[in-house]
Regions:
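Conserved G/P- and acidic residue-centered "switch" motifs that form tight phosphate/ATP-binding loops
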Residues: 111
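Active-site-proximal beta-strand elements of phosphoester/diester hydrolases
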Residues: 207-211
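N-terminal beta1-alpha1 cap of cysteine-dependent amidohydrolase-like domains
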Residues: 1-108, 118-119, 126, 130-160, ...
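The feature captures the ABC ATPase H-loop/switch
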Residues: 114
Length: 230
């Protein structure tokens, strides 16, 4: 009997009933399990010096959604509408990204994940789309859906199997300046970057999206990640 590959999934800390707990949205677990993977929660309060050990035990890395990335990480001052930040999580995920890339592990970056990946590689973020990009489509409405356009021939297009998709949208931040090591491969109608991947095609499999595929019926991204992990 073959063994299902294990992947690391970042699990943030939350205050629940007055106690600090490590949490993981079960939608990630279900989506990864349905793709034939074993999700292993990696607490984002993990010391940055433990990142290498964390990724040594797995075949891939999933960067999950959550808080805003601290503006200090990309040389900006806090915007008045900046949301909650967790500098400890930032440090842990930056170290996990570096360790995973050093081992050429596949990375699937979701929502905050695309943002921290962009920051890790030298990019910057819009701290609040509504105020910094007036007229943008509603990106922070949990019930909203909007179309995205996917670049032909991109890894994302090959993974999704389509050049267009309708996605959910639960973010108020987004990529401003794209990191030198990434290229944009999906956009909302307002031009906001919704997908990115390595600019160098020889790099390991990395797909980053601004939406939450774990909450959609379509599982192509997780299936593509599983193929890369295998």
């Amino acid at each position: 009997m073959s063994t299902a590959p294990a992947v690391a999934v970042t699990a943030p800390r939350r205050l629940v009933d007055g106690r600090e707990r490590v949490t993981l949205n079960t939608a990630y677990v279900r989506a990864l399990e349905s793709a034939g993977l074993v999700p292993l929660a990696v607490p984002t309060m993990l010391g940055a010096d433990r990142a290498g050990a964390a990724v040594a035990a797995v075949r891939g890395l999933v960067l999950t959604g959550g808080e805003d990335v601290a503006p200090a990480r990309y040389g900006a001052v806090p915007h008045p509408r900046l949301g909650d930040i967790d500098p400890v999580r930032d440090a842990a995920e930056l170290a996990l990204i570096a360790a995973a890339r050093a081992r050429r592990l596949p990375i699937l970056a979701i929502c905050r994940g695309i943002q921290i990946l962009n920051v890790a590689l030298g990019g910057t973020l819009y701290q609040d789309l509504d105020s910094e990009r007036p007229g943008s489509v509603p990106h922070s409405d949990a019930t909203a859906r909007h179309p995205v356009r996917v670049e032909a021939g991109s890894l994302l297009e090959r993974t999704l199997g389509t050049r267009s998709a309708t996605v959910n949208s639960r973010h108020h931040q987004a990529i401003r300046d794209l990191a030198p090591g990434l290229r944009a491969v999906a956009w909302a109608d307002d031009g906001v970057i919704e997908g990115a991947e390595p600019a160098d095609a020889s790099e390991a499999w990395i797909v980053a999206v601004q939406w939450h595929p774990e909450d959609l019926a379509e599982r192509a991204l997780f299936d593509g990640f599983a193929r890369a992990v295998a």
